[in-house]
């Protein structure tokens, strides 16, 4: 597909012109410009699609079983361990990895790093998908998902950390949908919608910074609910929120690096030259950002240990594991 940019460089219009000079219809765009036979062949020869089919074949029946027979039918949750794998990994794992959206949005829209613009949309898409699936995981692992709106409307609980997380994640998900909307409007050739979103992009970015910073820190503060279940070397009541926030910075940047590398390797036929030519250069730039974030994380980690007087724990077995983690996962990268 040919891609051309009209005179207004701030509003690139992707028309995807057909070889005969016509414009692709929405239906043809959905089929990626391929015939049904070509699309089917492309689908079947992609090994990732077969892996997804296998995952869905196992996961969908379990998901239906969870909703028809209850949470206990598919998990080993208890009152001592009420949060399962979906909630533990989906919320505390996916949300930091999804920080790429507000990080790249801040860099490009606020700090003027236009050299990072070619990968900004990829970062925004990563963030949107990560937060969306975090909400999906939450609906799966919460005992009564039909009451998910209670902390937002009926039983507010403004003094609770979970109230902050619920409101901010839901609001930030809406902000991310708006931030990625210009890409959809380009695809649908609706320029008025794109111009409107572009006109409020600074406000959306600032809202994303505020919301993401607060709920990333709030997720770290959730560990203060159960301090006895976390080893002192990994727990510091005064610094827990900033530990989580700093880890989200290098996790989000690392996610963009991996996604860009995968796109360049396996989806080059769908990427324009501007993106492909910028991947290596921006990988180095994001790598430097990760290094600074890791240094900051390590310093704050040591400050937390010193503040809580936990040096003696470093001589225990868990202390050796902690030092190994810091060496392999922080110092070496």
Where are these regions (language model features)?
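Long, contiguous internal "core" modules enriched in hydrophobic/ aromatic residues
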Residues: 55, 59, 115, 153, ...
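Juxtamembrane/interface segments at transmembrane-helix termini
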Residues: 4, 66-76, 108-116, 120, ...
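Intramembrane catalytic core of multi-pass membrane enzymes that act on lipidic substrates
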Residues: 118-181
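Membrane-helix interface motif
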Residues: 63-75, 139-149, 216-228, 302-306
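Membrane helical hairpin/interfacial module
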Residues: 81-146
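N-terminal signal-anchor module of multipass membrane proteins
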Residues: 2-100, 104
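Membrane-interface segments at the starts/ends of alpha-helical transmembrane spans
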Residues: 36-45, 65-69, 79-87, 152-161, ...
């Amino acid at each position: 597909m040919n891609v051309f940019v009209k005179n207004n460089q701030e509003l690139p219009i992707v028309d995807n012109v057909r070889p005969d000079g016509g414009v692709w219809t929405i239906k043809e765009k959905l089929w990626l410009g391929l015939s049904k036979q070509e699309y089917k062949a492309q689908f079947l020869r992609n090994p990732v699609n077969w892996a997804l089919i296998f995952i869905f074949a196992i996961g969908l029946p379990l998901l239906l079983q969870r909703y028809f027979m209850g949470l206990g039918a598919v998990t080993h949750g208890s009152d001592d361990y009420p949060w399962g794998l979906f909630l533990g990994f989906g919320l505390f794992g996916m949300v930091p990895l999804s920080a790429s959206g507000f990080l790249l949005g801040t860099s490009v829209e606020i700090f003027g790093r236009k050299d990072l613009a070619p990968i900004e949309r990829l970062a925004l898409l990563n963030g949107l998908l990560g937060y969306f699936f975090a909400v999906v995981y939450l609906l799966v692992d919460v005992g009564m998902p039909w009451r998910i709106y209670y902390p937002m409307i009926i039983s507010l609980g403004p003094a609770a950390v979970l109230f902050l997380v619920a409101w901010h994640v839901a609001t930030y998900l809406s902000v991310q949908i708006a931030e990625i909307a210009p890409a959809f409007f380009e695809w649908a050739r609706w320029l008025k919608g794109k111009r409107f979103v572009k006109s409020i992009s600074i406000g959306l970015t600032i809202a994303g910074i505020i919301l993401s910073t607060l709920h990333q820190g709030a997720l770290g503060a959730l560990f203060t609910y159960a301090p006895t279940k976390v080893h002192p070397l990994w727990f510091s009541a005064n610094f827990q929120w900033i530990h989580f926030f700093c880890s989200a910075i290098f996790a989000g940047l690392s996610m963009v690096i991996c996604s860009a590398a995968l796109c360049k390797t396996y989806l080059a036929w769908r990427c324009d030259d501007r993106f492909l030519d910028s991947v290596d250069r921006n990988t180095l730039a994001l790598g430097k950002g990760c290094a600074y974030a890791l240094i900051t994380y390590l310093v704050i980690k040591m400050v937390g240990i010193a503040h809580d007087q936990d040096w003696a724990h470093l001589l225990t077995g868990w202390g050796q594991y902690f030092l190994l983690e810091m060496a392999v996962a922080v110092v070496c990268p």
